[in-house]
Regions:
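Conserved ABC ATPase signature
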Residues: 126-130, 134
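ABC ATPase NBD coupling module
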Residues: 64-79, 100, 217-221
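ABC ATPase "signature
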Residues: 211-212, 220
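Conserved ABC ATPase "signature" region
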Residues: 105-122, 173-174
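A short, proline-enriched helix->beta-strand linker immediately N-terminal to the Walker B motif
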Residues: 145-149
Length: 229
């Protein structure tokens, strides 16, 4: 379980996050939803360990990780632009992190992930020969072979549309449940958040407006902001 206790963060005297508290269960998919500048990316960076809070704590599996550096947390992120190496093939991108951690995944586990994500026929292609959906799946595979303790996704569907978007959504759910992997998604798209998530966190100007199930968000909005979002 991941627990955030009274997290606050300011920059140059401006409060970006204010007293954020919530708990996320193992294998839950939680979307952080908010408009631009709401603080959702700052919250993602706090969880990842890229920055530290001004106050509050982050507890993961009963361990206080507030001051634990990013590289020791074991949380992995898939960025909005995929951050793939264009000069490498899809396969070499997928196994790139295993160069320094060869025991993290076996060859059979890598093969299973590739099959799960439907990438078998694309392994020898360079990144610029892949579609947006294929790049997203390569980025997911590259992250999953490292066996993250938590999976963080920054706007994973923003560059996709139609059938491809629905396919990636299905695969994210399959991964979270199949690997018992807590998954946190940052998005600005209410439809995306409400259809993929177990819980949705709505942030407005650094404050929690509501944290609940999609049904609660739709049928029991706690503020006019949530109702009109």
């Amino acid at each position: 379980m991941l627990t955030l206790n009274n997290l606050s963060k300011s920059y140059d005297g401006v409060t970006v996050l204010n007293d954020i508290s919530l708990s996320i269960k193992d294998a839950e998919i939680v979307s952080i939803l908010g408009s631009s500048g709401s603080g959702k990316t700052t919250l993602l960076n706090l969880i990842l360990g890229l920055i530290q809070p001004d106050s509050g704590s982050i507890i993961f599996d009963d361990e206080d990780i507030t001051l634990v550096p990013m590289e020791r947390r074991g949380f992995n992120i898939v960025f909005q632009d995929y951050a793939l190496f264009p000069n490498l093939t899809a396969y070499k991108n997928i196994v790139y992190g295993l160069r320094n951690y060869p025991d993290r995944s076996t060859a059979e586990e890598v093969k299973s992930l590739i099959q799960l994500l439907g990438l078998e026929e694309h392994l020898d292609k360079k990144i610029d020969k892949l579609s947006g959906g294929q790049k997203q799946r390569v980025a997911l595979a590259r992250t999953l072979v490292m066996k993250p303790r938590i999976l963080l996704l920054d706007e994973p569907l923003s560059a996709l549309d139609g059938v491809i978007k629905e396919s990636i959504k299905e695969q994210i759910v399959k991964i979270a449940k199949g690997f018992n992997l807590t998954t946190i998604i940052v998005t600005h798209d209410p439809e995306e958040a409400l259809t993929i998530s177990d819980k949705v966190l709505i942030i407005n100007q650094g404050n929690i407006e509501q944290f609940g199930t999609p049904s609660q968000i739709i049928n029991e909005p706690k503020s006019e902001f949530v109702k009109n979002f």
